[in-house]
């Protein structure tokens, strides 16, 4: 209802229709994301039973991702866990667990990063990650793709963060929280790069292979580590909790819209949203189909949702109203640069991403 609220503040209609675009983006990402989190759950179970450690990682990944309906139980269980989080309000419990799991996740990645540093040919991974190719800085596509990645990584989809923002206490310093989110997200991405890319080159894999790198390279590292089975289990469990939390964010936006627009109860709205995600996801469990869906959503739908959200906030609702809201919980005034950056620079850059999404072959992904 946030888009509708913004439009009504100007005496206009159509907010509900515009709001469906970012909601479709959230639902589309959730459909693909649930499949990947199902693979994470399967890998955690494999680490627990030992099958992950005794099987070739390529074979293990192929068995759970190469055909339709190849990971139905794990995929379904992930959706059920997410529905439980949303229906029974156990998000507080998940948040408490994540306060332990997220630091553990970082610690495990540091341990993995140290281990892979001693693998043969790991130096090529560090070169790939750290040696700059300056010519790409002058290629507009580099910047467009980087911003498109930021939309996805920081959930700037025009829906999920708006819904979660409505649940924050009034005295929350949103600016500080946003900055910390961006910093920690970047740190996590860099740490993952130091853990994964050297092992990619050590094992002769393609660094552009996508999500499968998580399920092939790291199990190979765990297989060569002392107590690797234990490390593998805790690693994938940490990723599982992070995945469930992110999935709940995406489906919360869809559920809230269903609850408001269709006049459903909270439980019915969650079941409808989760059921829709599962119903579609079951038919695209093969990694190539799932990848195609995620490409379409992240290349075309998410950037449009991002610019719609910004236009609604900074132009329709108004920059003055946004500044008033952002000052709640802050002791320092906002920078004078905030208004021009938000109204002009950010929206211009977001519009460029949308434009190039359609004219660059393959989009921005």
Describe these PLM feature segments.
Residues 2-24, 34-92, 121-144, 208-215, ...:
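Inter-helical loop and helix-membrane interface segments of multi-pass membrane transporters/permeases
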Residues 37, 241-250, 270-280, 298-325, ...:
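Hydrophobic alpha-helical segments of multi-pass membrane transport proteins
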Residues 75-93, 155-170, 241-254, 311-317, ...:
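Transmembrane alpha-helical segments in integral membrane proteins
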